[in-house]
Amino acid sequence: MNRNNIIGLFARFINVFYRVKKQHWIFGADNGLTYREGSKYLLEYMVTNHPEYHCCFITQRHEVYEELVKKGIPCKMNNTYGAIKEIARAECVIFTHTRGDIHYAYKKQGRRYIYLVHGMPLKRAKKALSKETMRILKGQKKASWLKKQRMKLANWLTTGHNAKDIEFVSVTSDFLVKYMRLQYSENVGIKTIGMPRNDALFQSERMKNEKWVKGIDGKFVITYMPTHRKYGAGVITPTPFANRPDVQNWLEDNGVVLLMKNHPTMLNRVHNTQSYSSIIDITKMSLDPQVCIYHSDVLVTDFSSVWMDYLLLRRPIVFYIYDDFETEDVGTYYDIREDPPGLFCYNEDDFFQLIKQIKNDYDKFRPSDRIIHKYHKFIDGNSCERYFQAITTPDNYT
């Protein structure tokens, strides 16, 4: 039995003595490892605008804890006695990535689970795939009966709730509702209220103070943010133009910098990052994705839904489709080529040509208002307020 499971035994015992308290909300993200995504932005919104609510971020990393303490943001280390008491009293458990964002948040009377999804539906999500498909994708062996029982026990001790316990999830437009529904059972509500993390894209003063790449002020910034391969079990995305000194020289001469940011799920497969004067790998810099896209003049991706967030900035988008993700990986719910939100390329030469075209005629390649409104019902930076209202007055947001 590992450490978390042992602590889980203690947490289960402690929970007997604490009832849920109204207006006590806890937040977590990224399996307890980082402070970002929707939980970050909704928590800070709550602290500023609704101080009558008792809110606290739960983390499993001491670096995150120290960072938040310095910022004056309520935070506790997940495995401490103080955090276990905080969690035991929480009315709302709010998370962004997995149920493992916060340990020991067991089901109990009066408790609510709110999942701030970390992306809009495009590629097929785990919840829409069979366990057998996921096992094959990841190259895993079939679990034995004994292992399955151990996993169930671990879930009971450390997590204590399931996907069906989620009260609702949100989408950014009505177009996306039917695809989000493919990922959740009918008892999970779907509300078109936006994403809390996108409010930051409307907050220029805030973004000036967020951590960002040093030494690139005044550069024309192109950020490449591909999605994961096989949910972290696939081959890492190669850095474009790593073996093209001609392209690197052109970028340098024209004041262009290409930032390479692999998907967080692939982080364990990123061993040797490649950086040059005009190409910088930022994968391991622990940068907030919203900060990355805010400071980018052009976003390059493939099947990550980050481009939907980026539409709010009304800047050019390039889809660099370099492999057979659609047929040999998880695939997608719909074909974005049928109503393209940006430009498409399939090899480095075409990618380079698009960079030159956009640099020379930037405004020509901005997304249309029609495309923006297809993926965003609201373009106002008020998603956190809508989320607050959806949680506190749910009948008004069915």
Protein language model regions, located:
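C-terminal amphipathic helix plus adjacent low-complexity
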Residues: 1-3, 12, 19, 23, ...
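A nucleotide-sugar donor-handling region in carbohydrate enzymes
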Residues: 2-9, 121-132, 137-232, 264, ...
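Conserved catalytic-core segment of nucleotide-activated headgroup transferases in glycan assembly
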Residues: 36-44, 182-183, 190-273, 345-347, ...
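Donor nucleotide-activated moiety binding/catalytic core segment of transferases
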Residues: 75-92, 259, 264-308
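A donor-sugar binding/catalytic signature common to diverse glycosyltransferases
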Residues: 93-117, 121, 287-330
